[in-house]
């Protein structure tokens, strides 16, 4: 395999992830999830802890790979990952953390477009829109008062992609007004 091109390096990285990290969730057929460490610990292989955002980024990488070199195996993997996340998350797409939900929503939006999955981000979008506070942003997690860029950045992108541009613009305006530092960097939160 050639590694002197970005496509070659991407293919090599994908093969390493597929070989080392992709497993059935709780030995259930039709499911796949990403083990979060290598070498992996038993608790990670058994998916006792669930790193929702990590799974979202993995699904996004699988979607990127499909755009690079389409494959029916990748489409099957994406469907199995989307199904597994629903099972592992107790039958819900939502959880307590808005950054997790937004990253999973973004990954599902892209995967839906590319793979035509029978899953979508509607419940995540509803949850995030319903959590927008008077300031125009969502908190880091349910019941929290911490307002941060890591949650609101991906929420804004997800809402914009879903056509909720007014909410997305209010969020980005709030980030610019409240978290933008003089250096041009964005602070974590307030």
Please identify what each model-predicted range represents.
Residues 118, 146, 165-168:
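Internal amphipathic alpha-helical segments of the cytochrome P450 catalytic fold
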Residues 109, 138-140:
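A generic "structured core" feature
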Residues 152-155, 159, 163-190:
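Active-site cradle of extracellular carbohydrate-active enzymes
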Residues 1-91, 114-135, 170, 174:
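Low-complexity, Ser/Thr/Pro/Gly-enriched N-terminal "stalk/linker" regions
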Residues 47-67, 96-113, 146-161:
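Well-ordered alpha-helical segments within folded domains of soluble proteins
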Residues 96, 136-138, 147, 178, ...:
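Flexible, active-site-adjacent loop/turn segments at secondary-structure boundaries
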């Amino acid at each position: 395999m050639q590694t002197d091109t970005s496509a070659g390096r991407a293919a090599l990285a994908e093969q390493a992830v597929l070989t080392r990290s992709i497993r059935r969730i709780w030995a259930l057929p039709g499911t796949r999830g990403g083990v979060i460490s290598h070498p992996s610990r038993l608790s990670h292989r058994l998916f006792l802890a669930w790193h929702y955002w990590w799974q979202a980024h993995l699904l996004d990488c699988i979607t990127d790979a499909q755009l690079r070199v389409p494959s029916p195996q990748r489409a099957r993997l994406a469907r199995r990952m989307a199904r597994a996340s629903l099972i592992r998350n107790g039958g819900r797409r939502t959880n307590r953390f808005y950054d997790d939900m937004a990253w999973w929503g973004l990954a599902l939006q892209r995967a839906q477009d590319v793979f035509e999955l029978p899953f979508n981000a509607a419940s995540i979008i509803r949850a995030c829109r319903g959590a927008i506070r008077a300031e125009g942003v969502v908190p880091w997690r349910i019941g929290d008062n911490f307002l941060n860029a890591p949650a609101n950045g991906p929420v804004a992108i997800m809402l914009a992609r879903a056509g909720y541009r007014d909410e997305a613009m209010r969020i980005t305006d709030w980030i610019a007004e409240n978290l933008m530092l003089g250096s041009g960097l964005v602070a974590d939160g307030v």
